A protein has these predicted regions:
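Short, structured coil segments at secondary-structure junctions
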Residues: 90, 110-112, 166
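Active-site-proximal loop->helix
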Residues: 86, 104-111
Length: 168
């Protein structure tokens, strides 16, 4: 957490929610990484920018998660831009919260999936969109967890209940 007026708070307006960027252990590890790997990449990963530290972390994440493989992205924007296109096709549908982050919206646009948008955190509208998309092979509900523009939190229990009910 970060401290504001003497009170520990979660900083939801930055990518450093918990204030770990200034934590002594993180700083010490960053200094060690600079000594071992230098500063910056020679290029983007798919050309020649992958270092052993990336491979090591991806393997450790795969072992921890029990997955065949893992890929790291340099930003959430890049991750969202690369996700939807790789898992969805024209016979699929994405049902997206109206206030989703721009990176989610752009990622969905890059996919060839049918697109539906439900009113922010409105479970009745989400259910209506799930019904409208019922002919799709796969229906994927896309939502932020915490919405960066207004700080609201997704109704994950409600979304999960509707996803289960509509096989999404």
């Amino acid at each position: 957490a970060v401290t504001v007026a003497g009170k520990a708070v979660i900083n939801l307006c930055a990518n450093n929610y918990l204030g770990l960027a200034n934590h002594p252990t993180v700083l010490e590890a960053a200094h060690a990484a600079l000594d071992d790997f230098g500063f910056g990449m020679a290029s983007v990963r798919f050309i020649c920018g992958t270092q052993t530290i990336h491979d090591t972390l991806e393997k450790k994440l795969s072992a921890f998660l029990g997955t065949e493989d893992t890929i790291l992205y340099p930003s959430c924007f890049d991750a969202n831009g690369g996700l939807f296109e790789t898992i969805l096709g024209p016979e699929d549908a994405v049902i997206s919260d109206a206030l989703n982050h721009a990176s989610i919206i752009d990622g969905i646009r890059l996919s060839k999936a049918q697109r539906f948008r439900y009113q922010h955190n409105d479970m009745q509208d989400l259910e209506q969109k799930l019904i409208e998309a019922s002919s799709a092979r796969t229906r994927l509900i896309a939502t932020d967890g915490v919405f960066s523009m207004d700080g609201t939190i997704a109704n994950l229990p409600g979304i999960r209940e509707l996803a289960d009910r509509h096989d999404a």
